[in-house]
From Swiss-Prot:
GO cellular component: cytosol
Pathway: Purine metabolism; IMP biosynthesis via de novo pathway; 5-amino-1-(5-phospho-D-ribosyl)imidazole-4-carboxamide from 5-amino-1-(5-phospho-D-ribosyl)imidazole-4-carboxylate: step 1/2
EC number: 6.3.2.6
Similarity comment: family membership: Belongs to the SAICAR synthetase family.
The protein's enzyme class: ligase
One of the GO BP terms on file: 'de novo' IMP biosynthetic process
Keyword Signal assigned: no
Species lineage: Bacteria, Pseudomonadati, Pseudomonadota, Alphaproteobacteria, Rickettsiales
Pfam families for the chain: SAICAR_synt
Keywords: ATP-binding, Ligase, Nucleotide-binding, Purine biosynthesis
GO function term, MF aspect, one: ATP binding
Gene3D superfamilies to which the protein is assigned, alphabetical: ATP-grasp fold, B domain, Phosphorylase Kinase, domain 1
Organism (species): Rickettsia rickettsii (strain Sheila Smith)
Catalytic activity annotation: 5-amino-1-(5-phospho-D-ribosyl)imidazole-4-carboxylate + L-aspartate + ATP = (2S)-2-[5-amino-1-(5-phospho-beta-D-ribosyl)imidazole-4-carboxamido]succinate + ADP + phosphate + 2 H(+)
Record protein name field: Phosphoribosylaminoimidazole-succinocarboxamide synthase
Amino acid sequence: MKKKLYEGSSKILYSAEEDFLLIMAFSDKAILETGEIVDISGKGVLNNNISSFLMDKLEMIGIENHFIEKINMREQLIQYVEVFPIQVIISSVACSRFVKEFGIDEGYVFDKPIIDFKVRSREFKYPIVNEYQILNFGWLTRDEIKAVKEQALRIYDFLSGLFIGVGIRLVECKLEFGRVFNGEESIIMLTDEISPDNCRLWHINSNEKLGFELLEKEPNKVFESYQLIADRLKEK
């Protein structure tokens, strides 16, 4: 019988029969800026489908990731990864904090994608952390930071092209990475998910917001938006 190991705001991790494997289940829960948790019926099923599809695509271009296979509508089998305590945020268009903190016009397109690191902690409200702090805290080595940045940009470039092909702009995405050990050596591996929960997606022509950005102002449109993204990706 599988044992619950961890429950987050939108996913649950369970033990699997084999060592170093886990079962990741996608729930319908979503967290608002106020901290309130709401249910969007069917969201977990769509996120499982979308993330499975995108992780498979990334594997095809040589991006190591934790996804192994989809088990059922809500669950997937994943590789155990020692997850880094940081999130990697890649942005190519001014949104969110760039508008609030720097006064940049929303929608302004950057010359090159910008990478930010945040501490992976809801308790501390995901503060920005720089490379020198990451090194001094002992979270990653210099080589690991370099590898994470290179992989993050490659992933973002690939996903941007894929989404453009279905009429959607990838404005920003949040990625998580970790280590997988093979004897004394380790490799950097993409983990978590890639879905409308952690990607900022806009209609390419109208800049109409899709995915999680609708939670606060238009919650009744959230499922429809996730379904649209899933349907568009089926065309690829």
